[in-house]
């Protein structure tokens, strides 16, 4: 019944759900809205709060999304952006950003190496913050060596994590819990 006469909206609509914090007609607005909520949380002294934006790869090509990414990197508020890179949109995704995301998501060497490392690390119950930073630095170095381009999101001031298999729910939940502990703007791909 979604998007049918009398059905629910395909976008956030405050009159339909108490969980829709704002109303919109397009999902390219999700990062801007979540960043505004993160800034408001900081101004209100809500230190433990994490604002989350979910955006699809098709919507990521919108100019408003890029403006928000740029501002998120500059403001450094506690924001998690989840990029649902499913290569689905009303029309086919095209352009440089689509090519970039495909390059990141399909680097077989990088993804195999990353999965092997995280599989080994998953056998340890606790990893110290220092060890976590060390591993992240190694991961970033490997990414920059194996991927053709440097990471666009990190160049904009966001910590980048991914790509992650969103169909592996247990692994995804673990990653989301781990990301709660990392302050500042970050993007999960």
Task: Tell me what each language-model feature is.
Residues 31-38, 69-70, 80, 150, ...:
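Predominant activation on well-ordered alpha-helical scaffold segments within soluble catalytic domains
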Residues 1-5, 74-89, 109-112:
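A glycine-rich helix N-cap at a beta->alpha junction
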Residues 54-55, 80-84, 189:
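Short beta-strand segments
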Residues 7-10, 21, 26, 30, ...:
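Residue-level preference for alpha-helix termini and adjacent loops
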Residues 1-75:
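Cofactor-binding active-site loop characterized by glycine-rich and histidine/acidic residues
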Residues 87-189:
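Long, well-ordered, tryptophan-enriched scaffold segments
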Residues 47-50, 77-78, 184-188:
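Short coil/turn segments at beta-strand junctions that form active-site/ligand-binding loops
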Residues 62-84, 100-105:
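A short alpha/beta connector and helix-capping loop motif
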């Amino acid at each position: 019944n979604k998007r049918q006469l009398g059905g629910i909206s395909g976008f956030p609509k405050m009159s339909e759900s108490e969980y829709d914090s704002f109303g919109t007609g397009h999902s390219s607005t999700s990062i801007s809205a979540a960043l505004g909520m993160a800034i408001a949380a900081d101004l209100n002294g809500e230190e433990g709060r994490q604002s989350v934006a979910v955006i699809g790869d098709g919507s990521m090509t919108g100019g408003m999304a890029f403006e928000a990414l740029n501002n998120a990197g500059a403001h450094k508020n506690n924001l998690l952006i989840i990029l649902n890179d499913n290569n689905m949109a009303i029309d086919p995704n095209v352009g440089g950003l689509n090519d970039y995301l495909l390059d990141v998501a399909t680097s077989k060497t990088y993804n195999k190496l990353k999965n092997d490392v995280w599989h080994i690390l998953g056998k340890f119950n606790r990893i110290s913050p220092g060890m976590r930073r060390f591993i992240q630095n190694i991961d970033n170095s490997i990414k920059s060596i194996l991927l053709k381009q440097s990471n666009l999101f990190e160049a904009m001031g966001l910590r980048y994590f991914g790509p992650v298999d969103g169909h592996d729910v247990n692994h995804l939940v673990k990653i989301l819990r781990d990301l709660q502990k990392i302050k500042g703007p970050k993007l999960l791909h």
